[in-house]
Amino acid sequence: MLEKDFNTIVTKSLNNQAGFGFKIPDERSTITGFHSKNPFDVFGVFDKHMVCWESKYLPKPQSFNFNHLQDHQIDNLIKIYELMGSDRCLSVFAVGVDFGRNDKRVFIWKNDQLYQIKERKANQQNILKKEFEGLTNYVKIKKGEIDMAEILEL
């Protein structure tokens, strides 16, 4: 699975669970040579919450380097959370990790937990493989979908 496939799962999950999801197309160069920057990967609506989602995917348990997360992406997620609050917003940074067989986990940091991610990025503190193995803030991909209601409860 690639990161784009992971984002397809997120979008499909939103659309199939009485919500709305849209994958923002990847950045492209314009005719004038300017590059657009996507604010994050997916947006949508679920259970009266605006959903803003940035995804990263690891094909196996390994360290996650925050160089893969752009400053503007985490800043945009935090800004939306600050403007809307957790009662109307689900701003998510997610790292999917394939643990093999039928064990594909989606580690979730949402809303006020995004400050921890921003701090770790600023301090260049990777999420280590061993740390992933001990985290409990995840949902599993089941039958090609993520249970969005389960994410709201995390």
Predicted regions and their residues:
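N-terminal interaction modules that seed assembly of large macromolecular complexes
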Residues: 33-45
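Mg2+/Mn2+-dependent nuclease catalytic core
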Residues: 58-80
